[in-house]
Amino acid sequence: MDALQESPPSHHSLPSALPSATGGNGTVATMHNPFERPLEGIAPWNFTMLAALMGTITALSLGENFAVIVVTARFRQLRQPLNYVLVNLAAADLLVSAIGGSVSFFTNIKGYFFLGVHACVLEGFAVTYFGVVALWSLALLAFERYFVICRPLGNFRLQSKHAVLGLAVVWVFSLACTLPPVLGWSSYRPSMIGTTCEPNWYSGELHDHTFILMFFSTCFIFPLAVIFFSYGKLIQKLKKASETQRGLESTRRAEQQVTRMVVVMILAFLVCWMPYATFSIVVTACPTIHLDPLLAAVPAFFSKTATVYNPVIYIFMNKQFRDCFVQVLPCKGLKKVSATQTAGAQDTEHTASVNTQSPGNRHNIALAAGSLRFTGAVAPSPATGVVEPTMSAAGSMGAPPNKSTAPCQQQGQQQQQQGTPIPAITHVQPLLTHSESVSKICPV
C-alpha cells in the first residue's frame, strides 16, 4: 500500500489519495488514503447515518425485486413479452442492491473503503453497469409501450423473440458504456467521502473528460429522449382517441389517469438521475471545485433509491401482478379477498375502448381505469368474423370459445362472406366474456 501511495496516479491505475476537500465542520481535509482510514473532518455519526440509510434501502430493494422475480416465475400469465423488461428491471435493481448497497452499508460502518483497490474497481464497475441496465430498461419499457399502442409498423406485433432481442441490446450496450474505465479509458475510483467507488469525475485529464461526456450522452440524454418521445406519442394517441369519443366520461378519465402515471414515471426518472448527471457535469467542467464530501455523496444515494420505487411504480401498481403477488403470501385471508375481488372485476371493472380502423382490421386500445394496463389489439377473427380479444400487453386472455355461440358465429361468418360489415364495440363497457361479446355483436 505504501508503494501504491508513492506511485504517481495514471489513467490505468486507481489513485490512492483523494484531493483535499472542505469537511462537514468547515475544516479542510488533507490528502488521505481512502483504503486505510476515514476522511478527516467528518464526524463518525455521519457514516453511521449513511450506513443506516443504505441498509434500509438495500433491504427494501432486495425484498421488492426478489418478490417480482419469484411471482413472475410462478405465474405463467405474467410471463408475457411486455413483462420481460419489467423482470429485467427488477433483476438489474436487485444486483445493484446486492453488490452496491451491501458494500456501501459495510464500508460506511467502517467509515472508509476497507476492501482495497481491486474491490473498489469491481464495485464501481458493477454498480455503474447494472444501474445503466436498469436505466435503459426504463427507456426500453417506454418504447415497447409506444410500439404496442401506437403501432408505428402497422400489424407487426411484439413477440417473445423481439423482447429478448431488446434486452440483449440493453445489456451489451450498457457493457460497452461502462467497461472502458476498467480497460484504461478513465477509471473507477473512491468517491469524495471515500466509502463508495464511481467513475472518475474529478480528473482534469482529457481522456477522463471525453469518457464522462460519452457516458453522460449515452446513459442519460439518449434514454431520457427515448422516454419523452415514447410517452409523448402515447399521450398524443390517447388524446386523439378521446376526441373521437367526446361523450364518454370514462374515456377522458382513463386518458387523464394514464397521463398522470406517465408524468410520475418521468419525474421519478429525473429525481433519480438528474442529481447524478448534474453533479458529474459540474465536477467534470470544474475539477478544482471544492464540495462538501457529504453533499457530493447525495447524488449517488439518490440513484440507489430508484431500486426501491421502481418496482412500486412499474410493477406493484399493476393490478394483475398485485393479484398474483397476494396469492404467494402466507395469509389465507388476503388470498380469499383477492380471489373475490378478481372474480368481481370481471363484472365491475370498466375500460375505455378506443377504436382505430385500418383496411381489413379493427384495433382496440383498452385502458384499464386503475393502472397502465394496455390490452393490445381486438380484431375480427379470420374464421368467424367475430371480434375476439387477443393477447393483451398485460398478459390477459379472452375466455375460451363457448359452444353456445356456434349459431351466432355461423351467422357472423355468413355476414362476412356477404360483405355485411360487423360493428366493433367502441363504447365504454364492462369487461365481457367471449359469449357476451358475441351476443352483443350478432344477436340471435
UniProtKB/Swiss-Prot annotation:
UniProt source species: Petromyzon marinus
Extracellular compartment segments: 1-46, 109-123, 187-210, 285-292
Pfam families noted in UniProt: 7tm_1 (PF00001)
Topology within the bilayer: Multi-pass membrane protein
Location (main, coarse): membrane
Domain of life per record: Eukaryota
Glycan attachment positions: 25
Record GO terms (molecular function): G protein-coupled receptor activity; photoreceptor activity
Stretches in topological domain Cytoplasmic: 72-83, 144-162, 239-260, 318-444
Sequence similarity: Belongs to the G-protein coupled receptor 1 family. Opsin subfamily.
Lipidation (S-palmitoyl cysteine): 331
Known tissue expression: Pineal gland.
Protein name: Pineal opsin
PANTHER family, per the entry: OPSIN (PTHR24240)
Keywords assigned by UniProt, alphabetized: Chromophore, Disulfide bond, G-protein coupled receptor, Glycoprotein, Lipoprotein, Membrane, Palmitate, Phosphoprotein, Photoreceptor protein, Receptor, Retinal protein, Sensory transduction, Transducer, Transmembrane, Transmembrane helix
